[in-house]
From Swiss-Prot:
This is Large ribosomal subunit protein bL27. Keywords: Ribonucleoprotein, Ribosomal protein. One of its GO terms (biological process) is translation. The keyword Magnesium does not apply. Residues 1-22 are annotated as: Disordered. The gene is rpmA.
Length: 81
């Protein structure tokens, strides 16, 4: 029999990196076309007027203006300034 046992590896260290999701531009803020408004998984919020949706459901401004969140309809739009 061995007089020393084998080393066991740590059971920690498998956590994935955070994906930095969430609101990047808040309601009332001015934005330029192309500015990211929200990074999300799935359509938690939908694109309204002057807002585009990326391949990963990112919402971004299509025109310059002010961000407006429509809470009851879960929609984001850009009001042209």
């Amino acid at each position: 029999m061995a007089h020393k046992t084998g080393q066991s590896s740590s059971s920690n260290g498998r956590e994935s990196k955070s994906k930095r999701l969430g609101v990047k531009t808040f309601g009332g803020q001015k934005v330029l076309a192309g500015t990211i408004i929200i990074r999300q998984r799935g359509t938690r919020l939908h694109a309204g007027r002057n807002v585009g949706t990326g391949r990963d459901w990112t919402l971004f401004a299509l025109k310059d203006g002010v961000v407006k969140f429509d809470k009851p309809h879960r929609r984001v739009e850009i009001v042209a300034s």
